[in-house]
Amino acid sequence: MVKVEKFIPNAIDRIKEQAKGKTIIALSGGVDSSVCAVLAYQAIKDDLIPIYIDTGLMRKGETERIKEIFADMNLQTIDAKDRFLDALVGIKDPEEKRKVVGETFIRVFEEEAREINAQYLIQGTIYPDRIESDGGIKSHHNVGGLPEHIDFKGIIEPIDDLYKDEVREVAWALDLPEEICERMPFPGPGLSVRIIGEVTEEKVDVVREANAIVEEELLEQFKPWQTFAAVIGKGTGVKGDVRVHGWIIAVRAVGSRDGMTAEALELPWETLMKIESRISGEIASVARVLYDLSPKPPATIEFE
């Protein structure tokens, strides 16, 4: 486990050594980027410019929540929803989606960096991200999903040797609020990797609502490592007396220590039935709801 009393000053010194001037950070509101933001602010103060990109692929209410939490950090918010959705048109391959999101993400940051004359980028890459990218399991938008040519002088990754549970320890030591310290992992490419096949605005809207329902039903009571819903295709259903061809939603809830391995939670039947009833009842275009029992390995936690 990480020794936070040593890690924190070492990370601050590392940022001071690498960031030589205006530096931007990709702030998502997750524990990884939030820890990096606090460390960076302690290291370089007003040379840090936190930027949040609204990709249109975030969870329900997430953008508004992030604006509230980080209002005192001079947070700059960029509305890039149309840009990301346009870039994803026609793309079905999971790795291509990740790379498109990563490239669009970094290009938006480059544009902002030029506006403010920033030459360095801080990112919240953690150790499992590097393992999965280096091992060819999947690229991460802030690791293997980045374009080969980046216009920054350097990318700084202060927590790239930590596992998720260690990042949470550092977050508590930095006095970050519990909402951030215990925030559930969320993939860098956002809801795009919770949609099998091409990403469309309709699918994003469906999976966003389904995710919100799953989180409402499971987070507080069962405290999963990660839980979410994914749109995995279309299937036949019946709404009233009418035959429909609607979306199939897969629900995922896993327990884990560090994200490297995971087991599906054994949820009560009544809970699963309630989730199914809410999703199919509140989202008119959904025809079927499934529960994924796959462990990691052989599956990954996310569907893509």
UniProtKB/Swiss-Prot annotation:
Keywords: ATP-binding, GMP biosynthesis, Ligase, Nucleotide-binding, Purine biosynthesis. It comes from the Archaea. GO terms for cellular component: cytosol. The keyword ATP-binding applies. It holds the Pfam family NAD_synthase. PANTHER family: GMP SYNTHASE [GLUTAMINE-HYDROLYZING], GMP SYNTHASE-RELATED. NCBIfam families: guaA_Cterm. Catalyzes the synthesis of GMP from XMP. This is GMP synthase [glutamine-hydrolyzing] subunit B. It comes from Methanococcoides burtonii (strain DSM 6242 / NBRC 107633 / OCM 468 / ACE-M). The gene is guaAB.
